[in-house]
Amino acid sequence: MRARPRSISIASGKGGTGKTTLTANLGIALGSLGRDVSILDGDLAMANLGIIMGMHKCEVSFLDVLTGNADIKDVIYENHGIKVVPTGFRFEDVHDVLSKVKRERVEEIIGELLQQTEFLLIDAPAGIADATIISIAAAREMLPVCIPTYPSLVDCYKTFGLS
């Protein structure tokens, strides 16, 4: 019997703490252990997971799924032995998409991804804006990330309170 899939939001209230790097490395490490892993760039405004994974030239991305222009299966790419869902790098429609993103739609997409994987790691955006709250709320678990500075610890604590 297959274990219940795990969805983990990797989050922090502060930028520059290593969320994206941790998401990529944890995903690759789990994949190297034979686990079925998907990683999703939940940072719609400042997407970097695709860059780190060497996938900055993807034709379609998570933004296309959110706007209804693609199906989730169209934006799952294989890299380093894991599945990667990059957000993309189009600047012209990011703010428009952000203003229209509904928590229910993100949860629906997360549900579709969870049917296809054992671990779903979500690289959440920094801060506590709507996009961050949606990324954290859509996951079943949260892994808070901070650096050893007082502002980072306070911001991490605030973010942890959202889960």
Question: Language-model features: where?
Answer:
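Short, ordered loop/turn segments at secondary-structure junctions
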Residues: 15, 42-44, 89-90, 125-127, ...
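P-loop/Walker-type NTP enzyme "switch/lid" segment
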Residues: 39-115
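Short, solvent-exposed amphipathic alpha-helical segments in soluble enzyme
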Residues: 26, 101-102, 160-162
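Short coil/turn connectors at secondary-structure junctions
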Residues: 3-6, 33-36, 80-81, 116-118, ...
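Conserved protein kinase catalytic domain
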Residues: 11, 50, 63-66, 73, ...
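Short, conserved glycine- and acidic-residue-centered signature motifs
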Residues: 23, 99-102, 152
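Walker A/P-loop phosphate-binding motif and the immediately C-terminal alpha-helix
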Residues: 2-43
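Conserved catalytic-core segment of NTP-binding enzymes
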Residues: 108, 112-115, 119-163
